[in-house]
Amino acid sequence: MLLLWILVLVVGIAYLAHRRVAPLPALGVVAVYLLAMGAWSHAPGWLLLIFWVLIAVVAAPLLLPDLRRQYFTKPLFIWFQKVLPPMSETERDAIDAGTVWWDGELFSGRPDWDKLLAYPKVQLTEEEQAFIDGPTEELCAMVSDWEIGQAMDLPPAAWEHIKTHGFFALIIPKEYGGKGFSAYAHSQVAMKLATRSGDLASTVMVPNSLGPAELLLHYGTDEQRNHYLPRLARGDDIPCFALTGPLAGSDAGAMPDTGVICKGEWEGKQTLGLRLNWEKRYITLGPVATLLGLAFKAHDPDHLLGEEEDLGISLALIPTDTPGVEIGRRHLPLGAAFMNGPNSGKDVFIPLEYLIGGQEMLGKGWMMLMNCLSVGRSISLPAVGTGAAKFTSLVTGQYAQVREQFNVPLSAFEGIQEALARIGGNAWLMDSARMLTANAVDLGEKPSVLSAILKYHLTERGRECIGHAMDVHGGKGIIMGPNNYLGRSWQGAPIFITVEGANILSRNLMIFGQGAIRCHPFVLKEMALAGREDHDQALKEFDGLLMQHIGFAVSNAASTLVLNLGVGHFEKAPGNRLSQGYFRALNRQAAAFALLADLSMMLLGGELKRRERLSARLGDVLSHMYLASAALKRYHDLDSPDHLQPLFTWAMEESLGESERALDELLSNFPNKVLGCLLRVIVFPFGRRHTGPSDAMDAEVAAVIGRAKGDPTLEELLAGCYRPQSAEDPVGALQHAYDLLGASHPLQKKLHTALKSGQVKPAAGEHAIDAALHAGVLQPAEAQTLRDAEAARRKVIDVDDFSKEELTQAEGKVR
């Protein structure tokens, strides 16, 4: 009986903490329970004394704030100031950049699902939809990935179409002659282009991402906006932006490029300006750019502007015909044809008016870049990764039906089904995350942490989809030529892994490294107090935050235990019967994540910055919870249709499984082994619940991408994908073969039955169709239908070959 009283006490305290009941009322409830326990439980006095002492230990700091600050908070504050990792100015700007959105809810340990579901659905305007259905569709039809690769350039007609129809002006407001499209529309355009050609998508997306237009919109002077934005919108100027250098890469803090404040001659007059020296590389659109955005470090050694000498990272806009600018040569990134190359400048003099935002923004360049990068990185590269997944879903699902081995379609093999499921399931999951994040940008957010999550996970999953597609296609994907619709995508996949922050860096340093500070309810505020000079007031504020932080950590520990023991099953959750279980699973994971994140930061302090693999695993948990949230939001917005259950269930099991795997690995490698074992009991009291999609789920998703055009589940998965209809196009030829083989399936079955029964016995060298026609099993029209289907199948299966003369290396073309 006594054990039952103790069990109720422990569970009750955990539940009060889980519900985040205020400390003093919670202590009051516990005190009343202990009085009852003393009266009726026959508990020994020494045990009750221990419980009352524990209550006193907890209550004393709450009831005696002055003593708490003096003997608890003050030493902790001094320790916190010592262990706080040093932070460079560029790191501080990166952390301060952007806004916190749903990532903050996940970090809270208790996400408000009603808040997520209340966000408006993504939607295109009529004008945006017309642009996608019209000029974007037309642009896709104008290009061939193979021909682009042979010419090492887009066709002239495509360049003209891009300029004429404002593809470089998607984000430029209408008052400057641009399209003024939403972030979602921008993402839809980039994704559709990516389903046709990576080179085409890269060419269009860069001016609409981090570049002169974005920077001018946020920080440019009125004169700069009025001059440059209309020219960019019309395509009179082609922009590029130069940040990355040979030695420092994209580490702006180590940038060797300089601009020295000096006087020089400009348009016949002595003018105060900057003398620039720089060397950059990997700059997309650089070889054809007429307007160069440049990042450099500004210095004022002669104090022409003031006492400060090192002014900081600054940004300027420089016409590429300015004397001293060297630009035009090209890189060949894995043979991709989009314009990319180096540029440099030696003693290039520019007036201060060339600074983006004018002299007022001198030295504020890194802050400007970080704020703009969080928006662009939320849209462009996630759209390209999703485009790759949708395209590979389209062609691989059909190819696995068209191509046969051992007289059965490839799609019948379980090994192939596993690859098909990874492609199709990832495509729907990635699309959900892309849509949710673009929606956040349209709601006014600048989601810096979420943009890092999307950049990493959507480009990685895009590369995974291309890899699986190559495995299924086999030799068809390897032999280059006009009929290979996959090879150049495979060649170009590592490019998107590398740009805008290499993925290995994003995962190991940025996602949790930035998110732990930026999204945590208290850490950023506590760090700000640590640097304050008014020590007494800072201590007082730190004390208040510390009490909240401790309550937060205790609550998350209790929630982790309570929810994993099954209490969460009785709590209200939104959604239908299927999705409710997933909302509850994410509640469990969010509580566990918040607990482990807090403990990791407490145990390691500044060392966590160097324990990259622990940081990466915490980032993986946060990332997969976000992907799962996106899938739940999309499923809810579509009114939870039955036909989407295979894709939705796969996406949730994939995300939850990966999140649990990261938690498992984190606990196995936790810095304190004893604490790690204790935490494992709390986080996984019954072991892991989600290990990824089952074989049966994989088979269902594999079947989806092999279905005929018009199937509602397939159409939802492929929405926004360019689908050429001409049988002369290699992708169109695949669709044509799929349709003919589907229509001729009853005849194929009829022929196979006749062959098996011996009704049709082809002579040596005689085709089975001809033998069936002679035997009267097939009518002439039926025989022709089968011949047409087989010819279409053969056209798809065939690969290219070349004569020696055709392979003679032609002189490369440089625009």
PLM features per residue range, with description:
Residues P323-F349:
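Flexible, small-/acidic-enriched active-site or ligand-binding loops
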Residues K269-E326:
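A short core secondary-structure module
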Residues L7-Y15, A26-L35, F51-P207, E214, ...:
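Amphipathic, small/basic residue-rich leader segments at the start of a protein or domain
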Residues M547-R815:
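C-terminal amphipathic alpha-helical interaction region
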Residues P342-R377, L394-S411, N556-L578, A592-K609:
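A glycine-rich, basic-preceded beta-loop-alpha segment at the flavin cofactor/substrate interface
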Residues E445-G477, P646-S659:
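Charged, glycine-rich active-site and insertion segments that engage polyanionic ligands
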Residues G415-D442, M470, S623-R634:
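Loop-to-helix element that buttresses phosphate recognition and phosphoryl-transfer chemistry
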Residues A14-G28, H42-W46:
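Membrane-helix interface "capping/anchor" motifs
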